[in-house]
């Protein structure tokens, strides 16, 4: 069921599934430049894959049905997630994020650690952008400003989907294209700026004291397996899972395998 919250800057929208008084609440935060549709397979399988849990899947500000923040930033995105929890009557939750959603999860931990029961860091990395990466993001911002979001879609598809998916699943390629093309230019520019400005989360890793899943597609070239290994090594007691035949969007590319990995993690952590 879709929920909407009025905020000072506009509105925040999310899907709310499962029993309202469930013992475990899972939040799934999408990447760049997606919306909650990234998690369509997890939403569809919720009742069977994660039984008796409550699932909250937001559109980050500037994407989907959520309006942009006046000033973009990972802290602002994290605070929007906290506002969603407040509106949903949720004190603590499992916070999961993919790619940019992982950056939001790091910010949420720094700002709202008392509300985190567990973390799921998927196809993401801890370090800040290199100078080269920042320059590429500035070029993306210039392109979107000048020519619109559609001009960057083919490049994003090539970067985000693994070669196995691109070769074997044209329907999923088309699904991602639709998802990317509906991203508002203002949201894309705000999020890209936020990623340029984000801090290095490497020092954050050793402060994480809750059960943590680090998950990565074996074909991910944007945040490769080596990044996941480095994160997992720095987070005490974390669980590392590599997803075969998946690129940067493993929950979309290999949903059954990812759902099983999430369920096993939650079960071991006694959260399922």
Please give the residue ranges for each predicted region.
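Flexible "cap/lid" loop of the alpha/beta hydrolase fold
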Residues: 106, 110-154, 160
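Conserved alpha/beta-hydrolase catalytic His-Asp/Glu region
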Residues: 129-135, 147-207
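Active-site glycine-rich loops that stabilize anionic/oxyanionic intermediates
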Residues: 31-34, 99
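Short beta-strand element of the alpha/beta-hydrolase
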Residues: 23-31
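Gly/Ala-rich beta-loop-alpha elbow adjacent to hydrolase catalytic centers
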Residues: 97, 101, 105
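Catalytic active-site module of serine/aspartate enzymes centered on a nucleophile-bearing elbow/loop
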Residues: 238-272
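Active-site loop/oxyanion-hole signature of alpha/beta-hydrolase fold enzymes
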Residues: 5-17, 37-96, 260-264
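Short beta-strand/loop motif that positions the catalytic acidic residue
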Residues: 208, 214-216, 220
């Amino acid at each position: 069921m879709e929920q909407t919250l009025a905020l000072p800057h506009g509105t925040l929208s999310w899907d709310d599934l499962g029993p309202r008084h469930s013992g475990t609440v899972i939040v799934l935060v999408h990447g760049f430049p997606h919306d909650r549709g990234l998690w369509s397979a997890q939403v569809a399988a919720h009742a069977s894959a994660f039984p008796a849990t409550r699932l909250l899947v937001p559109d980050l500000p500037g994407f989907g049905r959520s309006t942009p923040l006046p000033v973009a930033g990972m802290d602002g995105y994290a605070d929007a997630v906290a506002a969603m929890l407040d509106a949903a009557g949720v004190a603590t939750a499992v916070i999961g994020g993919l790619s940019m959603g992982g950056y939001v999860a790091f910010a949420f931990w720094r700002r709202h650690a008392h509300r985190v029961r567990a973390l799921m860091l998927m196809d993401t990395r801890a370090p800040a952008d290199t100078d080269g990466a920042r320059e590429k993001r500035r070029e993306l911002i210039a392109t979107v400003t000048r020519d619109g979001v559609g001009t960057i879609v083919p490049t994003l598809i090539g970067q985000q989907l693994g070669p196995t998916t691109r070769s074997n699943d044209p329907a999923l390629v088309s699904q991602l294209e639709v998802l990317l093309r509906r991203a508002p230019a203002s949201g894309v520019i705000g999020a890209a700026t936020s990623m340029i400005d984000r801090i290095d989360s490497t020092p954050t890793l050793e402060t994480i004291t809750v059960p943590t899943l680090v998950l990565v597609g074996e074909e991910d070239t944007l945040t490769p397996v080596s990044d996941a290994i480095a994160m997992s090594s720095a987070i005490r007691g974390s669980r590392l899972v590599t997803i075969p035949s998946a690129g940067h969007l493993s929950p979309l590319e290999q949903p059954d395998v990812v759902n099983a990995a999430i369920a096993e993690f939650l079960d071991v952590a006694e959260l399922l």
